[in-house]
Amino acid sequence: MKIKTALILCAGLGKRLNPITLETPKPLLRLKGITMLESCINTIIKLKIEKIFLNTFHLSDQISDFIKNKDFQIDIQIVNDGKKILDTGGGILNMINKSQDDDYIIFNPDTLWSEDYINEVNKMQNFY
């Protein structure tokens, strides 16, 4: 079975990177000229996943604007945590409740993936 939907956790406050993350959400920080979020989305596209749910809270407008201004060739739905940050489990549950799928792969945008790891994820899906 192939997993069709990815969840990306983008709601965090990024406190460990203060003061940088006071004005820029951690997923939008750049490494080698590309944001961590864009790198994560590109990895998901390489995995041939069809849809992304992305949660937001801290500086959510910046993340929403970033997604709207990019031409990612994948369906991306933004789910805001609301008035209170839901933490990891709550954020995941909130995104799952907006989806009709049963199976997901979860990403943290601040994890950088090598091509070797992409191959390993593809192998894992063959066992799923």
Positions of PLM-derived features:
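Conserved N-terminal catalytic core of the sugar/cofactor nucleotidyltransferase
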Residues: 1-8, 16, 34-108, 112, ...
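Short acidic/histidine- and often glycine-rich active-site loop of Leloir-type glycosyltransferases
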Residues: 19-20
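Conserved SAM/SAH-binding loop
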Residues: 13
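Short catalytic helix/loop segments, enriched in acidic residues and glycine
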Residues: 23-38
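Conserved donor-nucleotide/metal-binding helix-loop-beta segment in metal-dependent transferases, i.e.
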Residues: 116-128
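Structured helix-beta-strand junction loops
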Residues: 23, 101-102, 127
